[in-house]
Amino acid sequence: MITLYPKRLFKFPVDAECISPDVFAEKSSDEIGKLRIWEGNRKRSLSDVFKIKSETGSSSEEFTIKIRGDVSKVRKIGFKMSMGNIIVEGDAGMHLGEGMNGGVITVTGNADSWAGAKMKGGTIEVKGNVGDYIGASYRGSTQGMNGGKIIIHGNAGYEVGCFMMNGLIKVNGNVGRYAGVHMRNGTIFIQGNSEGRAGAQMINGKIVVCGHIPSILPTFTVDDIKPKVKVNGEKVEGPFYRFIGDLADKGKGKLFVSKTRNPQLNSYEKYLEYNI
C-alpha cells in the first residue's frame, strides 16, 4: 500500500494521472516519487507535492493507494486504472476515475465534475456530493460511461450520465437538470429530487426518479403505471409513472417517476388506456 500526504494546500490545479494502481504497482517509493505531474503550468515530480509512505505486502490486484488530505485541486486520480483500490480521505478533484476499466475508488468527501467520465468498468463511490457531468462524455464526444458503477451518497449536478452507454449511476440525493441527456443505455437511479428535463434526447436506457420532478418533457409519452421498478436486480417500491422517449429523437428510453411524490402529474393518467 502507498499513502500520499499533500505537502501543502494546492493553489493551482494539479494534473496527476499517474496516481493509479496500474502505474504504482511494482515500483519503489523512489520510483513513484519521480513520476511526472503538472502543477499549473509547471512540471514537477510527485514527491515535490506529496509525502510518500510505502507499506509492502499487497498483491497487484489488491494494491491500494490511500490519499490523506485535501486533493480537491488534484485532477485525473485513477486515470484509466484497471485494478486495485484508491481511497481518498478528503475531497477529490475533477476527472476522478476518468476512463477506468476496473478497481475501486472511494472518496470520503466530495468530488468535482467529470467523475467517471468515459469509464468502462470498476466502481466509484463518493460519500459526499459531486459536481456536473458524472459518468458523461466530454464536450464534442458521444462516448460516455460504458460500464461500471458510480455511487453518490450526496447530491450531483447537471447532466448526470450525458451520452451514457452502459453501467449504473446511483445518486442517493438530488440531481440538477438534464440527467440522462443523450443517454444511449444503462441505468440512472435517483433517490432524491430532479431539477427537471430528465432524459432529454435519450435514445434508450432507464432513468428512475424516486423524488420530485417539476415536469416531464413534452416529447415523452406516458405509457403505464408500475407498482415497482427493477434497478440492478433489486426491486424498488413505487408506484411509478412510466414515460417513453425522447420521441423527438425516436427514442425508446424509459423514465420512471414516483407517482406519490409528483401529484402534479396526475393529469397524465387520462392518456392511459385504463387507470390504475
Which positions does each model-derived feature cover?
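Intrinsically disordered, low-complexity terminal regions
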Residues: 1-70, 76, 125-127, 140-153, ...
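Short, charge-rich binding segments
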Residues: 57-59, 77-80, 89, 95-99, ...
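LRR N-terminal entry segment and analogous cap-like coil->beta motifs
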Residues: 69, 83-84, 88
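Tandem repeat scaffolds
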Residues: 81, 93, 100, 112, ...
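Long, hydrophobic, well-ordered secondary-structure blocks that form the structural core
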Residues: 100, 104-106, 123
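Right-handed parallel beta-helix/beta-solenoid
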Residues: 117-118, 122, 139-141
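Extracellular beta-strand/beta-solenoid scaffold signature
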Residues: 131-141
